[in-house]
Every structure is written in structure tokens, then in C-alpha cells.
């Protein structure tokens, strides 16, 4: 059994990670660290786990007793922890924050998008889990970058559910504001754009165009629905073939002939992609669950690869479409 520890156990991504790990046939949770909830039952915070989890939060860190450590911490906290603690040499780490997503000679974290870096992830000791928007958008663009087709600015509009803002309530996450409402935030300035560009440049070294990304807050709890527009004269049939070939060995990305809906992916680790051609404009529609494929599900996917398990173990999930 893979023995796992979690640091930062009170948020939405941690709750989903706990749910996935307690139902994973090859994993045992050894500890869930939360300084603000130490001594409390997990179900005091994650009430959806009643009857499934009898663990309590702890402020202890028995790192020698685990094989893999997940960070579900605020941005900046993982880096502080890594710099201030003695990490066992063989301990594998999966960081769900943005601290190590950008490659640097100062760290050895692999960018953990399996559909891009599968081979490197399989042998990695430290993995940086991608951002939710970044995952959804990259999966819509990677095949084009592979074929050196991203030579002009890419227009992206994407809407996310309220869980993307985290568990702490804020002015834009209260039900009375969010319900029946929609708004733009961080237009052209979202923090996930650098990691998107990094990945595209990895496949297409000549890529120097802009990702003109406009994020929206939606009035639903979870999921990301993105539309991307790229100019190309290549026929739709050829583009579909490129996408199907690129994702042929990836279990969680599916190219769909019919138009797609967000509810087809909510509560799953899937990404669905639909392609349309309108004149010289290619419309790419990509959707994921922000908490699963965009966070905790992808973290478990990375764990499976790091421990040489079949990638879908513990991730065969039914969408909550009805």
C-alpha cells in the first residue's frame, strides 16, 4: 500500500483528495495535517465523508512514515515548508499550489500535466500539479502546438464554478452575489497564463503569441467550460485526426463529435474536447471539473504514474449529470 500524508486538509481540494484516497485500492492515508483543525474529526470539516473516514486532523508531521506527501496549501506555503523542513530523500511530493509550476534551476519539480509530461512524471520525485484553468486550456491547445500551428494570438474565454475561489468566503463567493450572476475577473492577467505559455513553448519552441484569456465567475459550484479560437486553414477532419492521435494513449481526454456540456465532466477526472471549423477559425471547446481534473483528480493521476500504477486506478468516476 502507498502510505500518504496531506498538508493543508481543510479546503475543497483537500476534501476531494481525501475522498479519492480513501476509495483508492492502493492507498492508505497516514495523516492529514491542519494546524487550524488539529484534534478535530475530518468529518467536522468535510461532512460529505460521514461513514467513510474516521481520521482526525493532526498538527504532527510523521514524514518518515509515508511514501507520498500532498500539499493542499495556500500559494507560497509549500515553498516555505520545503525550505524549512528536512524532507526524507525518498519521499515523493505532489504540490497542488502554484509554487513550483514554472521551471527553474532552483528546484527539481516536474510540471505534472500527464498529457504533456507523462514520461518525466513517471520517474519524478517532486511534481507540481497544474492549475485548473491552465489544465483545461492547455488540453485544448497541446495538439496544435505539437504540429507547430500556434502562430497567432489565441483567444480564450473560460468560466469557472465558485469552488475555484477556495473554501474561505469572500465578497464574490457569497450565494446572494454569485447566484444568477456572472462577472469577469483578472482579464488578460490571470496567474495561470505563464504556465500555459511554458507548456506550449515546450512543444512549439517558436511560440511567442499571446494567450488572450478572459476568465469568468459562474453561478454554479464546480467545473470549467472554456472556448478557444485559433486561426488556421487546415481542414477540420485533419485537425480532429491530430487531436485523436495526440490523446490516443491518454485515458482521461476524449474528442467528442457532438457539442459538449459541463455536466458531462463534473465529478470526473475527464476532459472533453469538441472541435468546430467556421471559415478560417477553429473553435475548440474544452471542459473539466476544476476540483478533479483541475486539482485533486490530477494529483492522484500523477501519484498513480509516480508509483507505476495503471493511471485510472481510483479515478473511474461517474459524472453527476443527474
Swiss-Prot record:
Source domain of life: Bacteria
Pathway the protein contributes to: Amino-acid biosynthesis; L-arginine biosynthesis; N(2)-acetyl-L-ornithine from L-glutamate: step 3/4
Cited HAMAP family: ArgC_type1
Coiled-coil intervals: none
Single Gene Ontology BP annotation: L-arginine biosynthetic process
GO MF annotation terms: N-acetyl-gamma-glutamyl-phosphate reductase activity; NAD binding; NADP+ binding
Protein name: N-acetyl-gamma-glutamyl-phosphate reductase
InterPro entries in the cross-refs: AGPR_AS, AGPR_type-1, NAD(P)-bd_dom_sf, NAGSA_dehydrogenase, Semialdehyde_DH_NAD-bd
Alphabetical keyword list: Amino-acid biosynthesis, Arginine biosynthesis, Cytoplasm, NADP, Oxidoreductase
